[in-house]
Amino acid sequence: MESKIVSKAKRLHFVLIPLMAQGHLIPMVDISKILARQGNIVTIVTTPQNASRFAKTVDRARLESGLEINVVKFPIPYKEFGLPKDCETLDTLPSKDLLRRFYDAVDKLQEPMERFLEQQDIPPSCIISDKCLFWTSRTAKRFKIPRIVFHGMCCFSLLSSHNIHLHSPHLSVSSAVEPFPIPGMPHRIEIARAQLPGAFEKLANMDDVREKMRESESEAFGVIVNSFQELEPGYAEAYAEAINKKVWFVGPVSLCNDRMADLFDRGSNGNIAISETECLQFLDSMRPRSVLYVSLGSLCRLIPNQLIELGLGLEESGKPFIWVIKTEEKHMIELDEWLKRENFEERVRGRGIVIKGWSPQAMILSHGSTGGFLTHCGWNSTIEAICFGVPMITWPLFAEQFLNEKLIVEVLNIGVRVGVEIPVRWGDEERLGVLVKKPSVVKAIKLLMDQDCQRVDENDDDNEFVRRRRRIQELAVMAKKAVEEKGSSSINVSILIQDVLEQLSLV
């Protein structure tokens, strides 16, 4: 997005408070850069471990671009709440039974944060915080400033969840797998109760927390969305009308990273599993749009037998691939033993790379050799694929990912399903076992990747492969235009700043 210099008299001080999870941190750091490029001061409030994940990119933004982004770190009182030592992120939480304790511990950040804000020469103007951090609503009231909610979801999924919660159609079906239409949607969308986000699942010790989240969101000034209006026509307007609040589309926020170093480091936890050189050498050696990138997200906890089916499918497909493996430590040990015993990496050498841990996802997706993305349908991954024109194989796991799959496959027509029908929620991995077999993996890969750019008649309108790739390339162009000067998202950022200024003038 274009930088703008605003007068010091009108400089705003945005306080960004992301949830302590990788998928929530990454877009909030991008938003901090977008706001700072408009001449504003930005303070990111987080914990020491989480701050280390984006230290490099924020340091570059300060030193090389002169952006005024400050990072304030407060430790979580993990001992007080019976959490494991240094447990500062949802990624490292060993059990969902500790989820309530984690939220209670995070709640304790309110007091030291408010003391810090009281001491600032330039007082806070606006809080942008994750929907889960309901206590930030109290802070906003205390400082008499607006609070804006960040969900990390697209408007399609936000509207779907809102309308299901409002009308409760999921309660009228006879079974958890019976599909029902979601009311109030621009397209006819059907989903099963089992596929709904976890917020619709009963969790006795979290129900009051969820209610506080909903209540604090109802008091918010508005909602900021990492998407762009051209991607979700009809859904943007319908969602704003449904919640009767301001909604600002400021994405795709990942496009604020225009340096290769930022693309490589984006979201890194410091445990680099592959070097930039090794990754680029592999991609540079492949034909355009021939490589399948495979990553099921930072919270993937699939069992070894399921991951083995995925690996065997990748091998049998015959396509070049980069396979990122993330799972629980005990599962990783077992899977690593299988990889060594079966000599898997040697069998696919020259055609496939296995990355055990963090990978430079944005850099890989942006490379011209990447032609497909097997994804869990998390929104960050989905919109990054759209930005770089990479069609998807959808393998949703939990949260709103089945809704995102509907958008990808049924509305936008830029992906194919691997065929998973039920979620793998935290703690259910062993009970559910293997849900996707090798043949389904191979079939989905062939549907997405079999015809590459050198063997397709681009004038064949009846070819689904051509239509899918043409459509996502069109969306990639729209995404880049949205964040350019006078683009829809760039304009939305300016409107957001003006709206906050006007809100402050009313106090």
Curated annotation (Swiss-Prot):
Enzyme Commission no: 2.4.1.-
Xref: CDD domains: GT1_Gtf-like
Entry annotated with the keyword Glycosyltransferase: yes
Keyword Glycosyltransferase among UniProt keywords: yes
Disulfide bond positions: none
GO MF terms, alphabetically ordered: UDP-glucosyltransferase activity
Entry keywords, A to Z: Glycosyltransferase, Transferase
A Pfam family the protein falls into: UDPGT
SUPFAM superfamilies (UniProt xref): UDP-Glycosyltransferase/glycogen phosphorylase
Binding positions (UDP-alpha-D-glucose): 298, 359-361, 376-384, 398-401
Superkingdom, taxonomy of origin: Eukaryota
PANTHER family: GLYCOSYLTRANSFERASE, UDP-GLYCOSYLTRANSFERASE 73D1
Family assignment from sequence similarity: Belongs to the UDP-glycosyltransferase family.
Stated name of the protein: UDP-glycosyltransferase 73D1
